[in-house]
């Protein structure tokens, strides 16, 4: 594909005390095939990248080049082009929680969002941040997803785990289990089901069945194990069906999720973080990514954390970041339709 036709992606560096710099460097130096799909530009700290390039990968620091804006990037193989944001963070030790690193990780995301809002990049790929470090750095967001939603001014969004053609949409994410139960309410469930329906339509699958996992064991078993499935989820599924969305459920999660892994379902709605994340990561590992649906631009992330325990050792694998970059490049050209369809669904 001609370079003028491929999407420009902002790759945020994540927490520089973690594995973000080294997996970013490996992704851009060792996977030239990505450059035929996109123009990757790092948003972060060039010095932290140089430290990873020389100290972890054993490469020449000269491969890291600072550019003023994404349009200045040449996409030359064997280089890492960086839009510098903020002061150097090369002083931050690997593997230690750092307020400076947490502040930087949040700032990198905010800068990437600003570049997306101005039309300078077509999508965002995020390396992992550490939530405690981000909070120590003065940014009180539960995680990437909520920060991104704030930066783009959207209220209806969902964290989506994806592997191949399988998508796990989450009703709640980074809250306590107690708060997750109360968070599964009628409004939130209606909104997410509309998002799933819009996303499926934008992917050309408007009639695809959407499996909705029950909150309680056995989806409540006719109220034996709780009322939420009967009082909240079942009516929301009916409202979605009335609106032309092919939602099914609530279904027992221990039946629905294995069926989805075996290919029966492409779109699944789960109620809380670990109901989706635990089985997904057990099955897919590095073959999964995290997509935020409900934003005006595509955002895809690795499906792992900062791995402080191995940061700087060279043991980190870049497979998830490579996959996230590939998925963002694939989704970016059609994301305008995803966004417009989602907006139309939210307005209905």
What name fits each language-model region?
Residues 136-158:
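Glycine/threonine-rich beta-strand-loop-alpha-helix active-site module
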Residues 1-144, 187-271, 275-290, 295-300, ...:
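Contiguous, glycine/small-aliphatic-enriched amphipathic segments in soluble metabolic enzymes
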Residues 150-168, 293-309:
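Short, flexible loop segments at boundaries between secondary-structure elements
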Residues 161-183, 187-191:
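Ligand-binding beta-strand-loop-alpha-helix segment within the catalytic cores
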